[in-house]
Amino acid sequence: MGVTVDVHQVFQYPFEQVVACFLRKYPNPMDKNVISVKTVEEKKDESTGLIYRKRIAICQNVVPEILRKVSILKVPDIQLEEESWLSLQKRNMAIRSHCLTWTQYASMREESVFRESVENPNWTEFIQTGRISITGAGFLNCILETFASTFLRQGAQKGIRIMEMLLKEQCGSPLVE
């Protein structure tokens, strides 16, 4: 089965400011679930200017305690891998992330893009699609997917609120035209 979450947001800030804010977003006291984010690889293609980054995020295990009675869910934290491709020239950044924990039982993938808005070149559009599919937990599959869907939606909205707050703090009021 699986569940999908789609998010679309326009930040009324220029692309470069939004991307810089995204890359510095975590850890953040507004989201205690993200413990750390570490860049493990970064390289620039000199011919195209494309910047590739691979980061590993360590997050708290947010699975409810009652479900952690199942041994496979009883882990202290969850690791996510994020890869991004930033083109300052084209003013877009593509991001792919997936869960490194529970890979034999679950698949969690997100694909995101930050790009210059077609509405206004001083704004930035954010589009994200996330999909979670649980396969190895028997009768718990449906329960875990429902929980994951709710958590993903809330997490996406929280991430947008954090971005808006950080952008306002670091760059001032949004560019309204």
Swiss-Prot record:
GO terms for cellular component: mitochondrial intermembrane space; mitochondrion. It comes from the Eukaryota. It holds the Pfam family PRELI. It comes from Mus musculus. This is PRELI domain-containing protein 2. InterPro entries: PRELI/MSF1_dom, Slowmo/Ups. Residues 1-175 form the PRELI/MSF1 domain.
